[in-house]
Amino acid sequence: MASAASVSSLADEVNCPICQGTLREPVTIDCGHNFCCVCLTRYLEIPCLDPGELPTCPLCKEPFRPGSFRPNWQLASVVENIERLKLGSQLGSEEEEDVCLEHREKVYYFCEDDEMQLCVVCREAWEHRHHTVRFLEDAAGPYREQIQKCLECLRKEGEEIQRIQLRENQRIQVLLTQVATKKQKVISEFAHLSQFLEEQQSVLLAQLERLDGDILKHRDEFDVLVAGEICRFNTLIEELEEKNQRPARDLLTDIRSTLIRCETRRCRKPEAVSPELGQRIRDFPQQALPLRREMKTFLEKLCFELDYEPAHISLDPQTSHPKLLLSEDNQQARFSYKWQNSPDNPQRFDRATCVLAHSGFTEGRHTWVVSVDLAHGGSCTVGVVSQDIRRKGELRMRPEEGVWAVRLAWGFVSALGSFPTRLALEEHPRQVRVSIDYEVGWVTFVNAVTQEPIYTFTASFTQKVFPFFGLWGRGSKFSLSS
């Protein structure tokens, strides 16, 4: 069988001088040169001749009569035999993929309007004549850039899902540790009680065991989900990297659907701890409420000492708005319309009538109680804020600004989320217990008298947070206790 090189050399001898492709239905003109019938016909249609002037040969420029060209059947037979040799030598190779399926010509161009790869014959077709047509490599450049951007986005998404996995696994570990700690303390406390309390012990332990199992189950489901997401992203990245290394024709094949897949593929950002599971964990202390009459002291210990460390906090005079009057021990604050002669230091609130605690938290579980005494029309805001909270000018109290708080107003209570939400409570609280779990990211508010849950924020703390208090209304005041 003839070698591929010799066949290719022979094929070059029977190329059309106009389209540079293999002769199709070859015709001969007066000078003896041969052309594709279609190419020569289109050449004669070009309106570039003066009236009465004969067209010239595209190769030697000799004039010829337009109607004098005749089919060259012998040359057509030679071309057909060369084509057979050419196809035989390319059998099993990838060269065949570079051939236009319609005209059997090699593709050189890419139509950006129709997103089609064109041979020289396709390029001259009327449907592409007024389109933007570029060489394959030139057309591939912008698409390579788009793929590169998609790869960068996918890699960032992959890194983000890995960060989520690490963060959520850390939260799971903290919750498992908390559950284990609660379990041991529940056992030790119930060991000193009567048979009546032993029944309660069994109930609580069973709930904790279910929570333990549910947390582990959620962890396994979360790990499977994250592993699947990572696998899908890695597969897509590998596919794009492999496609980006292909020749321009392969890269441009079905390029639009590939880009759409990249642009529409976004990672899910799952949470390892569902709101329902988190609510069950937070509500665990409330399961002991039936014991309130028999052992109020034990109930308080079960509700908070099993979960949180009492925080002995005091107000920071350096942050207090000039309209807030602090007690000498910095445990109480009262609103006054009279401005105090306070230095305007960077830490002080100058517009929002607020004050921070002297000390903040970077870890652990802490709780404190705020007793509120509101005058008519007054309000008190309690919660925690991030260390870099805005002190000067207007303060927007919402989680996006680093504020996790509830507002007790005359007749209603609101959770200050992205949009303030009025809460339906059985009793308007006069004492609010604020609890923070730094590692898990919970800020919980409970009626300190009735133990009725008020609200819980979920956050991801990255810096120091401080207990936060706001007060409004002449005569309104609050005091602190652990």
Swiss-Prot record:
It holds the Pfam family zf-C3HC4. The keyword Repeat does not apply. A zinc finger (RING-type) spans 16-61. Residues 293-482 form the B30.2/SPRY domain. It comes from the Eukaryota. One of its GO terms (molecular function) is ubiquitin protein ligase activity. Its main location: cytoplasm. It is found in: Cytoplasm. The keyword Iron does not apply. E3 ligase that plays an essential role in the differentiation and survival of terminal erythroid cells. May directly bind to PTEN and promote its ubiquitination, resulting in its proteasomal degradation and activation of hypertrophic signaling. In addition, plays a role in immune response regulation by repressing the phosphorylation of STAT1 and STAT2 in the interferon/JAK/STAT signaling pathway independent of its E3 ligase activity. Mechanistically, interacts with the intracellular domain of IFNAR1 and thereby inhibits the association of TYK2 and IFNAR1. Interacts with IFNAR1; this interaction prevents association of IFNAR1 with TYK2. This is Tripartite motif-containing protein 10. The gene is TRIM10.
